[in-house]
Amino acid sequence: MRHDLWIFPPNRDCNGGTAWWLDVDPEPVLIDCPPVTEATLVFLNRAAGDRTPKIVLTSREGHGRLGRLQEALRWPVLVQEQEAYLLPNLLLLDTFAEAFTTLSGLQLLWTPGPTPGSCVLLAPPPANVLFCGRLLTPLGPGCLGTIRQARTFHWFRQLASVSRLRDWIPPETSPELASGAALGALKGELLVPYSGWTPPPSLS
């Protein structure tokens, strides 16, 4: 879809969720777990080249068959510390608390609500994409927003996380939005413009 960005087919092991590959130097990132197929492994090995990418998990909803994927690739995994206990057998597992910056300058922010350890990843310009996991989900073509689902961990913390995220994003940037949820409601679109971020309901 872009020379630096790749999207994988929906992952049935993640309730139809979406994983992304962002090609940045010196450390590319795989965001959430794609379907673990031979085609996926061939692509990821070719895309990585002689680099060691990092696998970033935006929530427990994006784990899929992560153990099998890491066994094949031997890449380190980064997860918010609240959900590290769900991955006891991984060989290379790093955690963060409130925020984290990768070697490539990608910024992570803890955004609890959808799950206890939900987080987002901001790729600053020139990539200029916000990978928002399940915090923002498709509402319709060109539109992402926050919705309460049966699996939502804490609705009011989710609303607070969305408000905090708005303040955290640098005002001079308007990143495109990449959701980790199922994208069917976007009707063929993949990225959503920043203007398509629908405000959440009031906290009051």
Where are these regions (language model features)?
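Short solvent-exposed loop/turn micro-motifs enriched in small/polar/acidic residues
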Residues: 13-15, 93-94, 112-116
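Active-site HxH/HxHxD metal-binding segment of metal-dependent hydrolases
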Residues: 34-105, 196, 200
